[in-house]
Regions:
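Single conserved hydrophobic/aromatic residue that forms the stacking wall/gate
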Residues: 1-15
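Helix-coil boundary and interhelical linker segments in multi-pass alpha-helical membrane proteins
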Residues: 27-36, 94-115, 146-152, 185-197
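N-terminal signal-anchor transmembrane alpha helix
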Residues: 30-56
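Cytosolic, membrane-interface loops and tails of multi-pass inner-membrane proteins
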Residues: 50-82, 134, 214-229
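Short, non-helical or kinked segments that cap or interrupt transmembrane helices
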Residues: 58-67, 129-142, 169-177
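Interfacial segments of multi-pass membrane proteins
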Residues: 74-78, 100-104, 123, 137-167, ...
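Loop-to-transmembrane alpha-helix initiation sites
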Residues: 154, 170-178, 189-201
């Protein structure tokens, strides 16, 4: 009887532990999903559409390349408008993270920005309200890298900016930025969700700039900053 009681108690403890672990996993998935959705919703707020509409009365899709991003607005509307787009795209990533922290104050800023920022990239690139026709995600991705990985993210962005200044090719610098983060994130975090997110961000950047990369390969890409000698 004592042995049976001990076995029963052990099974009961195991069941309780299993239940606790499963509940924690479910809660973890829920909070991550909420942060991703929150980031996505803020990401869909394309600053360029509001700035261009206010400045010209036109839809951003009818301006230049039609891309709702800083480079297109700055080139075809003006520097002031381009800076406003830049500021707005940075701000929406920050605000999404702050709201995420208010919802989950027990989580670290790293975890909060990892998911809200990652969601913002998808929202910016593929907003449902524009049938998936969003921006190319350079500013949003840079902001996400800096807020999530700190100095590492900033260094990647600086090097990417230098690539643009030296070559004049914005698509090349854009792809270099997240690609540079891959080996360092792997070294620091190993095979982690951080590495998966950076890999996906790099693939997204390649997809969004594939036409520009193609033109670079075939010598057809114009010099965006005209600094190439």
């Amino acid at each position: 009887e004592i042995a049976s009681c001990l076995v029963g108690s052990e099974m009961c403890i195991r069941d309780r532990c299993y239940t606790v672990i499963e509940n924690k996993r479910k809660m973890c998935m829920i909070y991550k999903s909420i942060l991703l959705i929150l980031g996505y919703l803020y990401g869909t707020m394309l600053t360029a559409t509001f700035v261009v509409k206010h400045s010209t009365g036109n839809d951003v899709s009818k301006i230049g390349s039609g891309n709702p991003g800083m480079a297109n607005v700055m080139e075809h509307i003006g520097k002031k408008e381009g800076v406003l787009v830049l500021a707005g795209d940075i701000l929406k990533v920050i605000v999404a993270g702050i709201l995420g922290r208010l919802l989950f104050p027990d989580k670290t800023w790293h975890d909060i920005f990892l998911y809200t920022g990652f969601g913002a990239i998808f929202g910016h690139n593929y907003p449902l309200w524009r049938k998936g026709k969003g921006g190319k995600g350079v500013t949003v991705t840079c902001t996400w890298l800096i807020l999530t990985f700190g100095v590492l993210g900033a260094i990647c962005c600086i090097i990417g900016g230098m690539v643009v200044l030296l070559t004049g090719w914005l698509p090349l610098g854009a792809v270099v930025i997240p690609a540079l983060a891959i080996p360092t994130v792997y070294f620091i975090h190993g095979k982690s969700i951080e590495l998966v997110c950076v890999l996906i961000a790099t693939v997204l950047m390649l997809i969004r700039h594939r036409k520009g990369i193609y033109r670079i390969i075939h010598g057809e890409e114009p010099l965006h900053l005209k600094l190439k000698r």
